[in-house]
C-alpha cells in the first residue's frame, strides 16, 4: 500500500510531508528545498516550469508566469495562455503534480493519495476547487483539513497535556485563527475565523506601491507601465520584507530598472522597519477582529489559552509577534516551523486515515489513536420570502453534521420551488455568497393546504455541502451536491485530467531529451580527451572511424536544442551517440586503463 502524503498547498509556497516511523517528515523537492514556490510559468518555447525554476524567471517572463493562484480558488478567474483559458484548479494541479512527483522520487514508489490543507475560512466552492485540483493532478484527496487544525496536530503530537491553544496563521495570501482544545488524543476545534484575502502578498504590494511612488517622484518615470520592471520590483519587495524581519532596514537596489530620454535609470531605495510597519499597520489590524470573534465564539478569554502558535511565513515579521502579545497577553510559541508544520499535520492525518485512526510506529496518544473534530467556518442558509437568509447550520458547528427544517411555498397553487443555498453571516440573501440553486418540482398544490418542504443540509468531514429538498406530501425528493457556477463539471475535470496527463508526458519527454543531450555532450568530451591521450595506441582506421563518429555526434549537438528537439532529431542524436559509443569502446578501455595506472 502506497503512503498517504500531506500537502500544504500555499499561496506563495507549498510543502509536502509523510509519516515515517510514527513521525511526520518533510520531503525535499527535486531542487533540495523543503518548500516549493507556488509558481507556474510557460516559456515561449512551450515549456512549463513549476516551483523555483518558474519563480526565477518572473522578471523576464511576467506575462506568462502565474503566482498566488490560491487567491482565486473557487472563482471564475481564468489565466489566458497560448489561446487557452486555464482555471485556478488547473494551475494548482500543476503545482500538485510537481509535489506528487517529488514525493514519488523520495519514496521510490507511486503516490496516489493525499490529504490537502485549506484555510479554515475557505468556503464550499473553494474547498471543492481544491479537491478538483488534486484529482486533476492524479491524486485521490482522502481529506481536506483546515490549516490551523493541521498545525495543532503537528504541535499536539509531542505535547499531550490537556490545553486550549490558539493558532494564528498568517500565510502568503490568507489569514486564519482557530481555537482548539487538545485532550486525550482528541483535537476539538472550538471556533475559527479569518480573512481569505489577507497575507504576505499584501505586505509585499505595499512596498511595491511605495517604491513606485518614490521612483516616480525622483525620476519622473512610471514603472507600472513596464511589466518586466514590475516583475523585478515585486521580487525585490518580497526580499526586502524578509530582510526587515531580522534587520532594521533593507535596501531595494535594481540597476537599469528603466530607460528615459537621458539614458538608463537605477532604483536605489532604503526602507526602515518602522516605516514598513507604519505602511502596513492597517493590514495587521485586520487580524484583530477575527481573533476577538474566535475567542468570543469559543466562550473563553485569552487567559485560558495554554499556547499561542504562530503559523505561516508572514508571522516572522516582528510586528506580528508584538501584536499577538498585546492582544492575548502571552508570548507566542516558536515550537513549530511556521512554513512546515501544516504539511506535517496533514501527513499525520494521512497516516491516521491509512492506519484506521492510529499512527503506525508512533508512541503515546498517537499510537492509541487521534481524533480530529473540526467546525464549519461559515453559516449555511437558504433564501426565503423577502430575500431573507434563513440559517440552517450556524458557523462553528461541529462537522460532519446534518440539519433539517420544514418550509412551505410562498403562494397557493405553487408547484415548484427554487432553493438558493447561501453561505455567509449576513441577514439578507443578496449579501451572502450563493453556493448554487436547484429546483424541486411536482409539489402538490391546493388552496386549502400548505405543502411542507423539508430542506436538509449535510456537511461532510471535508466541509463540503450536500443539500436535499423533499415534498413531505408527495415524497418527491431532489438531492444535489452543491456545484456553483465557479466549480468544474465532471466533464471539465476529466478534460483537465487528460490535459494534465498530456502535460506530464510532454514534461517527461523534455527531461529525457535534455538528459540525452547532456549524455551526448559528456560522451563527446570524454572521447575527445581520450583521443588526445591515447591516439598513438590506435591504428589509422580505428582512429578515423572514431573521429568521424565524433564529428557526426557534434554536428547533431550543434544543430539540436534539447528544448526544441523533434522526434527525428532525437532519433538522429541517439543513433550518433550509440555509434560513437560502439566505435570508441576500445579507445575508452585504453583510456580508463591508463587513468587507473596513473593513480597507482
Task: Write out the residue ranges for each language-model feature.
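Oxyanion-binding/catalytic loops of NTP- or PPi-dependent enzymes
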Residues: 1-75, 79-85, 94, 101-600
Amino acid at each position: 500500500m502506497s503512503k498517504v502524503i500531506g500537502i500544504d498547498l500555499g499561496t506563495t509556497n507549498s510543502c509536502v510531508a509523510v509519516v515515517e516511523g510514527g513521525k511526520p517528515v518533510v520531503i525535499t523537492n527535486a531542487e533540495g528545498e523543503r518548500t516549493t514556490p507556488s509558481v507556474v510559468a510557460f516559456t515561449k518555447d512551450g515549456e512549463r516550469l513549476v516551483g523555483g525554476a518558474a519563480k526565477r524567471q518572473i522578471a523576464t517572463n511576467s506575462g506568462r508566469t502565474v503566482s498566488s493562484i490560491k487567491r482565486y480558488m473557487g472563482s471564475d478567474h481564468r489565466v489566458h495562455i497560448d489561446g487557452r483559458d486555464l482555471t485556478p484548479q488547473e494551475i494548482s494541479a500543476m503545482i500538485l503534480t510537481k509535489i506528487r512527483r517529488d514525493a514519488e522520487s523520495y519514496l521510490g514508489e507511486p503516490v496516489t493519495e493525499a490529504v490537502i490543507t485549506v484555510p479554515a475560512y475557505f468556503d464550499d466552492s473553494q474547498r471543492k476547487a481544491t479537491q478538483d485540483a488534486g484529482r486533476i493532478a492524479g491524486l485521490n484527496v482522502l481529506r481536506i483539513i483546515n490549516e490551523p487544525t493541521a498545525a495543532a496536530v503537528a504541535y499536539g503530537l509531542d505535547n499531550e497535556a490537556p490545553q486550549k491553544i490558539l493558532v494564528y496563521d498568517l500565510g502568503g495570501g490568507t489569514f486564519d485563527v482557530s481555537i482548539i482544545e487538545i485532550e486525550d488524543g482528541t483535537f476539538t476545534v472550538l471556533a475559527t475565523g479569518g480573512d481569505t484575502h489577507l497575507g504576505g502578498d499584501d505586505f509585499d504590494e505595499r512596498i511595491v506601491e511605495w517604491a513606485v511612488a518614490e521612483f516616480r517622484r525622483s525620476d519622473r518615470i512610471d514603472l507600472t507601465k513596464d511589466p518586466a520592471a514590475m516583475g523585478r520590483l515585486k521580487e525585490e519587495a518580497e526580499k526586502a520584507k524578509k530582510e526587515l524581519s531580522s534587520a532594521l532596514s533593507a535596501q531595494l537596489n535594481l540597476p537599469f530598472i528603466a530607460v528615459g530620454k537621458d539614458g538608463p535609470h537605477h532604483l536605489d531605495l532604503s526602507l526602515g522597519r518602522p516605516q514598513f510597519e507604519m505602511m502596513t499597520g492597517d493590514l495587521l489590524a485586520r487580524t484583530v477582529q477575527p481573533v476577538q470573534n474566535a475567542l468570543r465564539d469559543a466562550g473563553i478569554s485569552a487567559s485560558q489559552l495554554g499556547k499561542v502558535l504562530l503559523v505561516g511565513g508572514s508571522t516572522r515579521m516582528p510586528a506580528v509577534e508584538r501584536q499577538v502579545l498585546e492582544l492575548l497577553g502571552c508570548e507566542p510559541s516558536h515550537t513549530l516551523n511556521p512554513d512546515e508544520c501544516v504539511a506535517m499535520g496533514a501527513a499525520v492525518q494521512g497516516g491516521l486515515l491509512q492506519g484506521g485512526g492510529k499512527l503506525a510506529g508512533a508512541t503515546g496518544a498517537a499510537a492509541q489513536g487521534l481524533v480530529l473534530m473540526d467546525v464549519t467556518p461559515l453559516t449555511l442558509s437558504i433564501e426565503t420570502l423577502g430575500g431573507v437568509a434563513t440559517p440552517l447550520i450556524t458557523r462553528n458547528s461541529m462537522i460532519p453534521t446534518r440539519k433539517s427544517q420544514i418550509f412551505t411555498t410562498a403562494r397557493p397553487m405553487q408547484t415548484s420551488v427554487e432553493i438558493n443555498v447561501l453561505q455567509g453571516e449576513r441577514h439578507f440573501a443578496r449579501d451572502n455568497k450563493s453556493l448554487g440553486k436547484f429546483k424541486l418540482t411536482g409539489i402538490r398544490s391546493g388552496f386549502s393546504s400548505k405543502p411542507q418542504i423539508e430542506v436538509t443540509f449535510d456537511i461532510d468531514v471535508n466541509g463540503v455541502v450536500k443539500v436535499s429538498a423533499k415534498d413531505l406530501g408527495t415524497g418527491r425528493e431532489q438531492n444535489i451536491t452543491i456545484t456553483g457556477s465557479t466549480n468544474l463539471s465532471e466533464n471539465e475535470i476529466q478534460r483537465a485530467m487528460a490535459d494534465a496527463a498530456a502535460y506530464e508526458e510532454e514534461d517527461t519527454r523534455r527531461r529525457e531529451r535534455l538528459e540525452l543531450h547532456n549524455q551526448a555532450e559528456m560522451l563527446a568530451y570524454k572521447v575527445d580527451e581520450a583521443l588526445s591521450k591515447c591516439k598513438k595506441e590506435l591504428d589509422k582506421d580505428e582512429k578515423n572511424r572514431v573521429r568521424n563518429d565524433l564529428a557526426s555526434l557534434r554536428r547533431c549537438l550543434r544543430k539540436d536544442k534539447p528544448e526544441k528537439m523533434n522526434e527525428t532529431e532525437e532519433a538522429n542524436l541517439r543513433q550518433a551517440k550509440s555509434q560513437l559509443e560502439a566505435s570508441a569502446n576500445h579507445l575508452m578501455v585504453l583510456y580508463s586503463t591508463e587513468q587507473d595506472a596513473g593513480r597507482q
